[in-house]
């Protein structure tokens, strides 16, 4: 799971890849915002709208904690009395199939109160409109594993820059393939 304290605090006027990630998360959360990498007035007002806080649009750890699920592509839901897979999927704007696929040990007609479910959001997890960093790759891999629990992931070590060298393992059998990008 991703550690929030690694996140960059963002201020109005900043530019760059983390501003793109902020804008991507806001867009995925349903806000109408362009992804241009510039923390201008539009981004500021959208952050205020998303957080419900006016008078300051600094993006701190508290704000990132709200946004990270939209970068990973899923959230979690603690089952309460009266919940059903249908009601949970509807609450988060996703499908029953996606919730069941992410939680293979859950019986749709027998939800236990207190069970923590993974709830994938209904959008493509791999973005094609932002620059990539090791941060984004880790979020994508985490999100893929949450959506597809049969997908195994791990780290082969670290790059010279200190980033994890991640791998994905899918399926079983005698044939193996390795792809490095």
Give the label of every model feature segment.
Residues 43-46, 63, 94-95, 159:
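Ser/Thr-centric signal marking residues that sit
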Residues 1-37, 77-80:
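Acidic, Ser/Thr/Pro/Gly-enriched interdomain connector segments
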Residues 47-50, 99:
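Conserved hydrophobic/aromatic packing and binding residues within compact polymer-binding modules
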Residues 71-82, 86-181:
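M14 metallocarboxypeptidase catalytic domain recognition
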Residues 17, 42-47, 83-87:
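Short, solvent-exposed linear patches
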Residues 27-30, 50-56:
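Short capping motifs at secondary-structure boundaries
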Residues 64-70:
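Short, basic amphipathic alpha-helical segments that act as recognition/interaction helices
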């Amino acid at each position: 799971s991703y550690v929030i304290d690694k996140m960059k605090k963002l201020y109005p006027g900043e530019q760059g890849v983390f501003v793109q990630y902020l804008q991507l998360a806001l867009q995925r959360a349903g806000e109408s915002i362009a992804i241009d990498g510039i923390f201008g007035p539009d981004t500021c007002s959208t952050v205020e709208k998303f957080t419900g806080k006016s008078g300051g649009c600094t993006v701190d750890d508290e704000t990132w904690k709200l946004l990270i699920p939209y970068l990973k592509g899923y959230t979690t839901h603690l089952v309460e009395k009266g919940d059903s897979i249908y009601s949970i999927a509807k609450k988060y704007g996703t499908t029953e199939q996606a919730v069941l696929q992410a939680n293979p040990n859950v019986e749709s007609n027998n939800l236990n109160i207190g069970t923590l479910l993974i709830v994938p959001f209904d959008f493509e997890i791999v973005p094609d409109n932002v620059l990539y960093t090791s941060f984004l790759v880790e979020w994508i891999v985490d999100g893929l594993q949450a959506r597809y629990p049969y997908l195994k992931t791990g780290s082969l070590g670290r790059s010279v820059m200190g980033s994890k060298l991640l791998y994905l393992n899918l399926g079983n059998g005698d044939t193996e393939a390795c792809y490095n990008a």
